[in-house]
Amino acid sequence: MELDIENFADLRDYLTRQEYVKLGEAVSFKNLHGGVSNRTVKVAWPDGRGWVLKQALAKLRVNVDWFSSPERIGVEAKALRWLNRLAPPGTTPTFVFEDMANHLMGMEAIPEEHENWKSILLSGQIVSNHFEQFGLLLGAIHRESSKSKSKFESKPGSEISREFADTTYFESLRLEPYYLYTAQKTAEATAFLNALARETLLQKDCLVHGDFSPKNTLIYRNKLILLDYEVVHFGDPAFDVGFALTHFLSKAHHLPQKRVRLASAAELFWQVYSDEIEQLDWARALGPRVVRHTIACLLARVAGKSPLEYLTPSEVARQRHIVLALVAKTPTTVPDLIANFISKIETYAQN
């Protein structure tokens, strides 16, 4: 029977057998909540050391049936090892171990003084430098991984594009529950979403995180640290950018007093990111795809399998109405999209 890391007695026995913990050693365990696709537990030693263990679930913890093979933990472990080399130093936790039999991986924990960026944003704290760092981080990952032969390749034939060619988990955890499910439920956007999903799988430009959001970002000593890599693949950079912009714009919708600042911060993120990748051959054609991915994700987060939990029912209805208008008449640039979305939110709220 597979280990359940949320059973702390069994987890202690497992770590002892694997010689990660000494017999009788005083370690503590704590469930970490917030994700839907994994069990996540922190292991802490008295000397201050800590690990975070992640165990992939076959059935995700949401209100509708949503399944994905727990074998994806192997992708997450491989992605973290690569990102430890690709991303700027200190922006990803250090990989420790993986156990495919138990669909489990371990990484070093970030010290307790950290905060979750999503929580910070929802509290109304908007720090421009955090958005700059976010753009720099994504730009670095996309830029450093975009060459067909990465300077980090470990052996002949191990180009990063081949290492992450499989899009199975991206499809089951992103395209299906976000785009295809929403397409089935929203007739006005069916053609738009289905076409975008097909197009996305044809783009093979760089390493794509697939879950690039404030929820998966910790802030420690004012530095951003990126988590969660289970849908990493070699694909369309526009998805990452649109996914991130969706979170900024949805929070701008939810927080009217911070709306202007969040919109400006979203533009800052886009500009910093654009500067980081402007020399790449695929950069010139990126903007319109980013617009479409942002629109698709904005709709999916109110009509798909994973709705944003902080939006009220009236905000869900408003966002759906506004995004469908953007589907019908799509802006061509990211700044135009941001301005359009904010303007429509303001107009709708006043009526």
Task: Show which residues each predicted segment covers.
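ATP-binding pocket architecture of kinase catalytic cores
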Residues: L32, S37, V41-K155
